[in-house]
């Protein structure tokens, strides 16, 4: 906006990109609202620095916006849409990034202390490493209209395209209290930590049996199906058993696959009421056998968890039926 012909570009403040990629991004910080600035990209070569064209602008302060108001804007979109202004949002990380029961680069962020729906969203940036932030961190995020995008993705409000360098940690260890809801309210509370009570499952199982493969489990809660999703990256759930139980509770992030509601446990603490602490039979294959009237023989393979030195014990069978344990996992 002013005269930039006399700027000594060799001696101005320079900020290097965090990664040598093309294209690259750099956060320009410390600007004063209302002041005019000139900026240009540069690259360092073996023969010295080379410069791009000069761009000028007047700095303006981002507008503070509540998470609830931003969620309202996001829900009004039908496709990926640039945000309409520079914004600053502040909230509490309510998922557990280190447990990774979410897509890589996902942060679930909610309004501090919120107990009503529409107070959380997803921040998505694959340059954010799981160990960078923790459950209970309070963060402030600057969203630039030139790059940040908003959309409803898998029924959840999501922001992408922001610069990871403009995520500032304000505090840590804040209390995150799940909201007790029913299964039919999961989509309303998308991205928020919730607790479902009166949960039942008739058969024990394993949360995640394969290292790089996601899994889903169907529980019942007050007569409704409750789908529990474990992401392929959630390694803390690998080969961890859960027990058959009536009237337990499960906690996690309210989420969805497309429009089908799911619960995403943030960590093993969220599923502790179904923890298998002793020897547990997790599956029998085949799960059902049928014999002809002339009789017959079938082999059953028993899968267990926490078996240790315990052995399989058989209960008495019906008249004319007998069984024996062959090698502690085969009947």
Give the positions of each predicted feature.
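Surface-exposed binding patches on compact interaction domains or structured appendages
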Residues: 280-283, 306-331
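Surface-exposed loop/turn motifs at beta-strand-loop junctions within extracellular Ig-like
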Residues: 43-47, 145-147, 256, 306
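Core beta-strand segments of extracellular beta-sandwich domains
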Residues: 198, 296-305
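Acidic surface patches and DE-rich sequence motifs
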Residues: 45, 220-221, 326
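Short, surface-exposed linear motifs at loops/turns and structural transition points
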Residues: 1-61, 280, 290-300, 310-316
């Amino acid at each position: 906006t002013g005269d930039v012909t006399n700027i000594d570009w060799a001696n101005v403040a320079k900020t290097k990109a965090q990664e040598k990629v093309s294209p690259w991004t750099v956060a320009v910080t410390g600007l004063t609202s209302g002041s005019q600035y000139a900026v240009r990209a540069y690259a360092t070569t073996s023969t010295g620095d080379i410069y791009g064209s000069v761009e000028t602008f007047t700095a303006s302060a981002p507008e503070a916006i509540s998470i609830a108001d931003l969620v309202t804007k996001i829900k009004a979109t039908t496709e990926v849409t640039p945000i309409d202004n520079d914004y600053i949002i502040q909230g509490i990380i309510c998922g557990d990034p280190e447990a990774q029961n979410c897509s890589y680069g996902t942060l679930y962020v909610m309004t501090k202390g919120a107990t009503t729906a529409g107070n959380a969203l997803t921040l998505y940036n694959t340059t954010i490493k799981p160990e960078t932030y923790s459950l209970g961190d309070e963060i402030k995020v600057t969203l630039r209209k030139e790059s940040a995008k908003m959309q409803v993705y898998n029924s959840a409000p999501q922001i992408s395209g922001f610069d990871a360098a403009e995520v500032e940690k304000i505090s840590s260890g804040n209390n995150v209290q799940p909201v007790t809801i029913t299964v039919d309210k999961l989509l309303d509370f998308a991205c928020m930590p919730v607790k479902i009570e009166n949960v039942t499952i008739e058969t024990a199982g394993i949360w995640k049996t394969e290292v790089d493969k996601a899994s889903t489990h169907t529980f019942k809660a007050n007569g409704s199906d409750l789908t529990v999703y474990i992401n392929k990256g959630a390694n803390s759930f690998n080969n961890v058993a859960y027990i058959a139980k009536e009237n337990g509770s499960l906690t996690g992030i309210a989420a969805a696959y497309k429009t089908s509601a799911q619960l995403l446990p943030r960590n093993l603490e969220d599923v502790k009421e179904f923890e298998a602490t002793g020897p547990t039979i997790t599956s029998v294959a085949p799960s059902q056998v049928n014999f002809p009237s002339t009789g017959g023989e079938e082999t059953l393979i028993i899968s267990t968890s926490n078996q240790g030195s315990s052995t399989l014990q058989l209960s008495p069978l019906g008249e004319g039926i007998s069984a024996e344990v062959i090698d502690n996992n085969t009947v």
